Amino acid sequence: MTAMVMTACTGQKAEKAEATQDNFNYVVDQFADLQILRYQVPGFESLSLKQKQLLYHLSEAALMGRDILFDQNCRYNLPIRRALEAVYTGYKGDRTDPQFVALETYLKRVWFANGIHHHYAEDKFVPGFTPEFLRTCISQIGASALPLREGQTVEQFVAEISPVIFDPAVMAKRTVQSGDVDLIRASANNYYGEGVT
């Protein structure tokens, strides 16, 4: 009854709002097996300044926690993500090149899954670009843009992350649950650190 009264009282405004909602594009991006969606947030404008500030600080806290989750999922996730982001932002070549498009898709999957493993299956992503393409891109962006450890060269960094990205046997699954192996050593997650049994 209330809905009928509200619609009857507002007349054209209700029709206009309905048309706006019908034309709203929910899909932001689509890649691999994923769709990134956006949602309408009716009433946001009517929130108080204090409520908006709370939302802002909660979103900032979520961003800070994001790196923790990346690190917990695999010890190489942060260096790989940061290197891929540096390549993505610093790439000077043709962005329609299939190798670059594949790198972009891989990076988006890493962002979505908080690491190099699928968010549900926990299997490692298979990159659609070659190790040579990644090596060339990383060498072109320079050491200052990379997450190098103290004393580590660009070549050493590439040699360290390449097997993690490209070798299907290295850190193949985020969490191994098969009973016939050492679950902690076989899993790629980073809850225990290196050498902990």
Language-model segments: which ranges?
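Bacterial signal peptide processing site
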Residues: 10-13
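C-terminal motif of bacterial Sec signal peptides marking the signal peptidase cleavage site
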Residues: 5-8
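N-terminal helix-rich structural modules
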Residues: 20-197
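N- or domain-start disorder-to-order transition segments that initiate the globular core
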Residues: 16-18
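Sec-dependent N-terminal signal peptides
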Residues: 1-3
